[in-house]
Amino acid sequence: MKMNQLLEAFWYILPAYFANSSPVVLGGGTPIDFGKKWRDGRRILGDGKTWRGFFGGLIVGTIIGIVQYFLLPEYYGSLGIAIELAFLLSLGTLVGDLIGSFIKRRLNMPRGYPAVGLDQWGFLIAALCFAYPVKTIPTGEVLFLLVITPLIHWGANIFAYKMGWKKVPW
């Protein structure tokens, strides 16, 4: 795979990465599950998934796509496509993260507990699925993202921990 293909894959997924990480900084407030419990007696999602974080991530990811358009308009073709793609990547990311939290609660994993694979690939796979109708990337680039995303996720978590935005470095 050529370097420009790797950069294109990274460029494509950038709104999703920002959408996934921004709730750490922008979150707080009312939990998405409103404190309700599932039929197993455990919280549906937990306090870590809030409306402010969800919509903050959606907005940040979409803004990243708009900025990308103005930096490299030929990649998208139109501002409308850039907004639509960034929005869907961001929405997919956040929905994927919510699904991951739901699964973790069912497995009785506490908030913030690392779930290797689920934490790194769940949001990525959901983002790619949501964005599929608008713009896809070649299989090789998807595979590259599957390899690089856990490393980026790990690095971002350590950075957020050192900045005091997260209580744990994972």
From Swiss-Prot:
Catalysed conversion reaction: 2,3-bis-O-(geranylgeranyl)-sn-glycerol 1-phosphate + CTP + H(+) = CDP-2,3-bis-O-(geranylgeranyl)-sn-glycerol + diphosphate
Coarse class of the protein's main subcellular location: membrane
Protein keywords: Cell membrane, Lipid biosynthesis, Lipid metabolism, Magnesium, Membrane, Phospholipid biosynthesis, Phospholipid metabolism, Transferase, Transmembrane, Transmembrane helix
Location in the cell: Cell membrane
Transmembrane stretches, start-end: 9-29, 53-73, 79-99, 114-134, 140-160
Pathway field: Membrane lipid metabolism; glycerophospholipid metabolism
PANTHER family tied to this protein: CDP-ARCHAEOL SYNTHASE (PTHR39650:SF1)
Entry function: Catalyzes the formation of CDP-2,3-bis-(O-geranylgeranyl)-sn-glycerol (CDP-archaeol) from 2,3-bis-(O-geranylgeranyl)-sn-glycerol 1-phosphate (DGGGP) and CTP. This reaction is the third ether-bond-formation step in the biosynthesis of archaeal membrane lipids.
Family in the record: Belongs to the CDP-archaeol synthase family.
UniProt-recorded name of the protein: CDP-archaeol synthase
Organism annotation: Pyrococcus horikoshii (strain ATCC 700860 / DSM 12428 / JCM 9974 / NBRC 100139 / OT-3)
